[in-house]
UniProtKB/Swiss-Prot annotation:
It is found in: Cytoplasm, Cytosol; Golgi apparatus membrane. General vesicular transport factor required for intercisternal transport in the Golgi stack; it is required for transcytotic fusion and/or subsequent binding of the vesicles to the target membrane. May well act as a vesicular anchor by interacting with the target membrane and holding the vesicular and target membranes in proximity. ARM repeats lie at residues 20-60, 61-121, 123-163, 166-207, 208-253, 255-310, 311-354, 363-408, 420-459, 473-513, 518-571, 573-630. The keyword Hydrolase does not apply. Keywords: Acetylation, Coiled coil, Cytoplasm, ER-Golgi transport, Golgi apparatus, Membrane, Phosphoprotein, Protein transport, Repeat, Transport. Residues 1-637 are annotated as: Globular head. It comes from Homo sapiens. This is General vesicular transport factor p115. Composed of a globular head, an elongated tail (coiled-coil) and a highly acidic C-terminal domain.
Amino acid sequence: MNFLRGVMGGQSAGPQHTEAETIQKLCDRVASSTLLDDRRNAVRALKSLSKKYRLEVGIQAMEHLIHVLQTDRSDSEIIGYALDTLYNIISNEEEEEVEENSTRQSEDLGSQFTEIFIKQQENVTLLLSLLEEFDFHVRWPGVKLLTSLLKQLGPQVQQIILVSPMGVSRLMDLLADSREVIRNDGVLLLQALTRSNGAIQKIVAFENAFERLLDIISEEGNSDGGIVVEDCLILLQNLLKNNNSNQNFFKEGSYIQRMKPWFEVGDENSGWSAQKVTNLHLMLQLVRVLVSPTNPPGATSSCQKAMFQCGLLQQLCTILMATGVPADILTETINTVSEVIRGCQVNQDYFASVNAPSNPPRPAIVVLLMSMVNERQPFVLRCAVLYCFQCFLYKNQKGQGEIVSTLLPSTIDATGNSVSAGQLLCGGLFSTDSLSNWCAAVALAHALQENATQKEQLLRVQLATSIGNPPVSLLQQCTNILSQGSKIQTRVGLLMLLCTWLSNCPIAVTHFLHNSANVPFLTGQIAENLGEEEQLVQGLCALLLGISIYFNDNSLESYMKEKLKQLIEKRIGKENFIEKLGFISKHELYSRASQKPQPNFPSPEYMIFDHEFTKLVKELEGVITKAIYKSSEEDKKEEEVKKTLEQHDNIVTHYKNMIREQDLQLEELRQQVSTLKCQNEQLQTAVTQQVSQIQQHKDQYNLLKIQLGKDNQHQGSYSEGAQMNGIQPEEIGRLREEIEELKRNQELLQSQLTEKDSMIENMKSSQTSGTNEQSSAIVSARDSEQVAELKQELATLKSQLNSQSVEITKLQTEKQELLQKTEAFAKSVEVQGETETIIATKTTDVEGRLSALLQETKELKNEIKALSEERTAIKEQLDSSNSTIAILQTEKDKLELEITDSKKEQDDLLVLLADQDQKILSLKNKLKDLGHPVEEEDELESGDQEDEDDESEDPGKDLDHI
């Protein structure tokens, strides 16, 4: 308490004593009064005094106020007064207009009161429970008090909330509050809660924070919204920055797609308010958080692809090429586009296709490079363009080739109507502005990064320096400017370009050494004792000379490795050379540039090193040091071993290619076998359908035959019923003649039916052709068996190829062992003969195994040829099956035609039978008219046989009776 009293300093005793007594009396009322109204009025009075007499109220009343929160929860009014009073005691916001010393004292006072409050963790838990109250007068001051506690002692309060049951979940409900004041202050509370605490960030994210925050941003109008949008964006950054789990959750939840409307800035005349600029700036930063180069590569790549697929990258490029965009927004947009396309081939290709809305249209890359080499543009904008160009070329060999091609003579526009990227880079490289020199040199170096092909292509570039003089190569022009003693920034940029160009490119080293003035210039620069400003240039010259030694293929007799090392030892000294080489990594700006890919410098004079170049220095510094101290014999042995290993690599690569080709051939054969199998199945299906159709025709024929038999029986019954008793002789004679005629017709019909039966029998015999179908099915089965055999043989070939791959792996392992033994040999000269014997033995062994592999490959080719012949035979068999099926189809058509004819003839027979039935019916009617009884149809059927017998015994009996 004494410390807290001392914070406010010495003040007049009179008033302080009076206010202290008043505060004491109010505290006594709060503690001892039994009436709720008295306690409420006392707390309200303490609230009014707490802003002016913060120390006194805090010292005397804090304990009583906490007790009120515990005991009087049923009365929201007194709880609200108590929370407001505690907020006034702990918060420092009211002290902003006080002098600086007083402000510092008040901040200490707020921290002390916060420490007293959270000393009992139950107080924070109590405050969290009060936030569940929906009453505005309780929830709002509770939110403000907890926010103030987090601002004062954030980590301690975060830990208490983290271990409290449902602590974070209670706070998440604030985002769903319908009262904007509470919702907005809830966002501020979550900002303070999630700052620098990954565990709380994960809990908040999985409590559906992303969905709620994005909804608030959308409701408030996206970038056109107010400060609430700004607060939500800051909270989103807290949740996502350096938190891989939340970033992955954000991407998988498809929240990246919801960011696209943020960048629909609309009409350029709509204006850019300060709040809109701030909001858009934070939105761009949030995109960069998701694709930051410091994130895991897999997470960054997936976010980049999602941004392209949902159209976010396209929207950013629209802002990039728009007019009227504020400078800081344009700069941040360039940086954002840079990281969205960095290392992503699809995004880089799209960016290369973007054109500026000019007449004629120009590529966006060209427009940006024009800004980079223009010294009148802001420094931060030029840095952003350089970063964008670097990201466009990062791991993009296609883009590197396109940039270098604009420098080659065959692609330069002779009319001069358009400016290419290469022309702009050359213009910047040889400009009078040192910053343009440095930017152009670094940009061109990135076009050569890890791309030996483009390094060789760039050697073809010729520059016309002046009228009447022959053209000069770009490499020579760079060394000429370097030797003219220009500004340090220019020389550093050119030296970085030359080091990048010559590394891993012996042809470029040869071109560089071919100019006799280059080596003396470098040795002279290194040997001189210059000031601290020139030490960096000396270190870069030493690095360039070391690269010329390490990547030298000894094609120039006057500048072979050994001669260059002797020159260094004679003119510079090896120790001095290594010391100068170490100046690079010891420079204060080297470590700053090595941290991040983005060229972020406070001012132009700090723009010295490039991030990718620092990686090159780290890679080459050690090997150059070793190369300087190596003897000529060690170099020769190392070269021989390298050549041997290269030969082995070439042989292994050759056989890998052969095996790859064989794999392709086998895959083609598999596809062909699969195709033949499908065709065979189709043919079998067709044959089955034909057999079923023929069976249907047979069934139809049998049915027709049965129907014809029934019709004949019915006709016989009618004819026999015509023999009646009691008919006149002339009538009987006439009837007999008619019956005879009907019999003749019946015999004629019977003969026709017999012919039809014979025809149908022929049809039955023709159905024996179905055996051909069975034979075709047998052929198909044989085809299936042959296909299975082919599959088995292909599997055997595949296993043989796998064994060859294992052999090649063994060869690679032995090659690695050879390399290790060679390095061991380089360290120990005494075992020279033994090492050479081992290498020769291993080489012979490798060649023997490779010969065996070649023989096996030849056998595989023969087997593949045999498979091709078998496939041809299968195809011929399938063709014969097709012809058989065609014959079956023809015979089936003939059968169908004959069956149709037989149906027509049967219809004619039925018509004749109907006529006969009509005649018989008329005869029966005549007999009835004559008075002779006529038997019914059933009686006739039952007595057919008896009537036939009577007629045969006494044909004249009926006449006698009459």
